[in-house]
């Protein structure tokens, strides 16, 4: 009986040695190292701090034009959003938001309303710069030029969709350097699945720290087969 036991133990040791030789991975337990994230990649319990940093600097932009059939009254032709870039009142928006405007109105989140001056625009990038004369200080968007957007980064789209009022949607950067969207214009878009709708154009796309990543520009309304795509928006 004792001999049989020794024989079984010996066989077990031999089999174990063969397995260790054939499969080195069994010699030790592999440990997984947790990936290191920077502060912009960490997932917070709430994005409210980022919203509070960025949202006050995102404004509503109204393109008003003369209606000759209504006794030349100014009426809202298109609407969009804009981003206050500095304390002097310079605002960036999309050119298509203010095209052919007879008057441009900017509404701040604190209730102040201003008539804006068009400083300049660029068809290639679909960007325009507005200027308002405001007293009492202006909120400005946080900017970090060292922060490079990466695929998978959490982003927030801030704007005024359908004139509902300021709205925040959340998603990730789905792609960078997207091309082929505008044959005559800029060919380097950020793609995101954060909801971007009519009225979001010119608004801010910010990271989880509230820092400006891009200017919301367009979304797919319909695909070539007539379907309405979801979760496909673009920012400059």
For each predicted feature, which ranges?
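Serine-dependent protease modules
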Residues: 3-12, 16, 20-236
């Amino acid at each position: 009986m004792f001999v049989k036991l020794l024989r079984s133990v010996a066989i077990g040791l031999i089999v174990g040695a063969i397995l260790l030789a054939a499969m080195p991975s069994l010699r030790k337990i592999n440990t997984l190292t947790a990936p290191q994230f920077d502060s912009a990649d960490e997932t917070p319990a709430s994005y409210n701090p980022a919203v509070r940093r960025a949202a006050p600097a995102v404004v509503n932009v109204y393109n008003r034009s003369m209606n000759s059939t209504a006794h030349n009254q100014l009426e809202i032709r298109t609407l969009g959003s804009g981003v206050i870039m500095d304390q002097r009142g310079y605002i960036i928006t999309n050119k298509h938001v203010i095209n052919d405007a007879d008057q441009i109105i900017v509404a701040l989140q604190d209730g102040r309303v201003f008539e804006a001056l068009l400083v300049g625009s660029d068809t290639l990038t679909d960007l325009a710069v507005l200027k308002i004369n405001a007293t009492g200080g202006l909120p400005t968007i946080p900017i970090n030029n060292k922060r490079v957007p990466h695929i998978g980064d959490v982003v927030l789209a801030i704007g005024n969709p359908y004139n509902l009022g300021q709205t925040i949607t959340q998603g990730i950067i789905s792609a960078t350097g997207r091309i082929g969207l505008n044959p005559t214009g800029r060919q380097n878009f950020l793609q995101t699945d954060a909801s971007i709708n009519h009225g979001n154009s010119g608004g801010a796309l910010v990271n989880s720290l509230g820092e400006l990543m891009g200017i919301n520009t367009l979304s797919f309304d319909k695909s070539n087969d007539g379907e309405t795509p979801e979760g496909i928006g673009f920012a400059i």
